[in-house]
Regions:
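Extended, well-folded catalytic/binding cores that form a central cleft or groove in large enzyme
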Residues: 1-559
Length: 559
């Protein structure tokens, strides 16, 4: 497995799958078929390669929901979610004429009794093993996981949602499987909208925060490499399309298999561009060496070249990809984003680069509105203006909506109220919404266009240092002694109304963001871990946010 995936959550999940799903089937020496649903396909893809499966005796991987040729002489491993659709598909494989010699069934988490009884009734004699392995989340990065539930946002925040409680219960169960996988063993005893009760002996502290805690971070133009890429470039399923010198197009996968990506992803774009001349020089030097070698190659030289060629070629490809991506990002930055960033930072921080308080946020916003920026960028700036004031007047709000020309799409702004974020500065909302107190970071060196620090970083640091305020963070259960007397913490702040080289053997902070997590917040988990060697921070959410994706989610809340 790759450098970035050899550690952290991905390695732990792959080890758990080997120790349960594969170990149970290893007693038989014959080769087996692995059958997956959509979720488990993504799960396995995130933590292993086909070569890893082959080495464990699995020769074929197939889709549970597609037509498959029977292979009656082979045994099949079914790895799937405990849903009616998956169970029905499994039963159909054995109901009439069995497709396989036997079935080893593994569910990602708890299988309801009615589904279990249905399987037992229809094909019990074909089932050799039936287990729940408690891995119902995706390990996206060494310290990042998701519940792979983009629909959760709508279910939780839509007014009068019919499936809010069911969605929250599902998320709670998924968090429990994470804790089980990490061997932190908290037991879920109670889950309400914004509290999470855990108990049991554990080395972890668990915090759950609501998206409304920090509406600013996912809206700002973030200028670190990974966050900037997913904001400005159309990257789908982590695939980045770039052009070669001959005009042809190629795709590159931006994940932890790419060591250069792991190295660069949390750097500021100014630092990344500082690396580009070196990368270009190395690529050019490689081409020159290749030309020289083509002219005077010996058998011994050819042998040496062949030995290092795969790794060498991979390194050169990675460098080419990141030269292209960095240039793409700088092109966007210089064309549009640079003009926005100063205004955005002043509105978010509440002060300018010299530390002078912004007395009239409208004067900061106005140049953005008058410039021919993209409508989405103007919406983002308007939101930052409103957030800075903790809501604005109805008259002012209507003027802003008209100025941005979104009278028929005002939900991009108005629907933030469904998250509990003040948009109109009514007395009741002002009393019910209290902003999280911020740490003073004025002594830290920052770029003028990157002065904002996500609220979550403050919370992570306070949790690690045992400084969370009891009045804001009601404790739910006893925390491990490793936290020096602190206790495991429940969740949302209660207002009224780069990958590490190894896993820490000490404490672990798990922070879950209900309603999506931004790339800038993901970066904070790595930074706090790096700064506190005795504690590893893992961050997770229902799904990963991009600014445009979040705005679309907000807009659809009243549809």
């Amino acid at each position: 497995m790759a450098a970035g995936a050899e550690h952290g959550l991905k390695r732990i999940v792959w080890q758990r799958i080997k120790d349960t799903l594969i170990a149970d089937c290893r007693k038989s020496e014959v080769w087996k078929i692995l059958i997956l649903d959509q979720f488990t396909t993504r799960l396995l893809s995130s933590c292993c390669k086909m070569s890893n499966l082959m080495s464990e005796g699995i020769t074929i991987v197939e889709d549970l929901h597609k037509n498959r040729e029977p292979v009656p002489e082979m045994k099949a491993i079914y790895f799937m979610r405990p849903t009616a659709m998956c169970v029905d598909a499994f039963i159909n494989d054995f109901k009439l004429k069995p497709k396989y010699k036997a079935a080893y069934v593994f569910f990602t988490d708890y299988c309801p009794d009615d589904l279990f009884d249905k399987m037992k009734k229809n094909c019990a004699k074909h089932i050799k093993v039936c287990k729940e392995i408690n891995v119902s989340f995706l390990p996206l990065e060494a310290q990042v996981f998701t519940c792979e539930n983009t629909e959760a946002f709508k279910s939780i925040y839509t007014p009068n949602s019919q499936d809010r409680d069911q969605t929250l219960e599902t998320i709670a169960n998924q968090i429990v499987t994470l804790c089980a996988t990490l061997d932190d063993q908290p037991a879920l005893t109670h889950f309400t909208l914004f509290s999470f009760h855990i108990q049991g002996k554990t080395q972890a502290q668990l915090l759950i925060v609501d998206r409304a805690l920090d509406p600013v971070s996912p809206i700002l133009h973030e200028l670190t490499y990974q966050a900037m890429a997913y904001d400005l470039i159309p990257i789908k399923d982590n695939n980045y399309e770039y052009k070669l010198n001959d005009g042809s197009k190629k795709e590159a996968l931006l994940n932890e298999e790419d060591e250069l990506w792991v190295k660069l992803r949390h750097m500021h774009i100014a630092e990344v561009t500082g690396q580009i001349p070196k990368l270009v020089k190395e690529i050019s030097a490689n081409r020159d060496e290749k030309k020289q070698a083509d002219g005077k190659i010996t058998i011994g030289g050819l042998s040496q070249l062949m030995k290092k060629m795969p790794g060498f070629r991979k390194q050169m490809t990675q460098k080419t990809v990141h030269v292209s991506l960095a240039e793409d990002l700088m092109s966007h930055f210089q064309k549009n984003v640079e003009k926005l960033c100063k205004a955005e930072q002043d509105l978010a921080v509440g002060a300018d680069a010299e530390g002078q308080k912004v007395k009239d946020p409208m004067r900061t916003l106005l140049p953005v509105l008058l410039h021919p920026h993209d409508t989405t960028d103007k919406i983002r700036a308007v939101l930052l203006y409103i957030f800075s004031l903790n809501g604005t007047t109805a008259e002012n709000l209507n003027k802003l909506i008209q100025h941005v020309k979104i009278e028929d799409e005002s939900g991009y702004i108005l629907n933030w109220k469904h998250l509990g974020v003040p948009i109109l500065s009514t007395v009741s909302l002002m009393l019910s919404f209290r902003k999280q107190p911020r740490k003073d970071r004025s002594d830290k060196e920052t770029y003028n266009v990157s002065r904002w620090t996500p609220v979550i970083k403050d919370i992570m640091e306070d949790a690690v240092e045992n400084k969370l305020e009891v009045k804001d963070w009601p404790y739910q259960s006893e925390c491990p002694s490793a936290w020096n007397g602190s206790r495991a913490v429940s969740a949302r702040q209660k207002h009224k109304g780069s990958s590490p080289d190894d896993l820490r053997s000490g404490s672990r902070l798990i922070l879950f963001v209900l309603g999506g997590v931004s790339y800038s917040e993901m970066r904070c988990a790595y930074e706090v871990t790096h700064a506190n060697k005795s504690c590893e921070v893992i961050i997770g959410s229902t799904h990963i946010l991009t600014p445009r994706g979040l705005l679309e989610d907000i807009y659809k809340l009243d549809k």
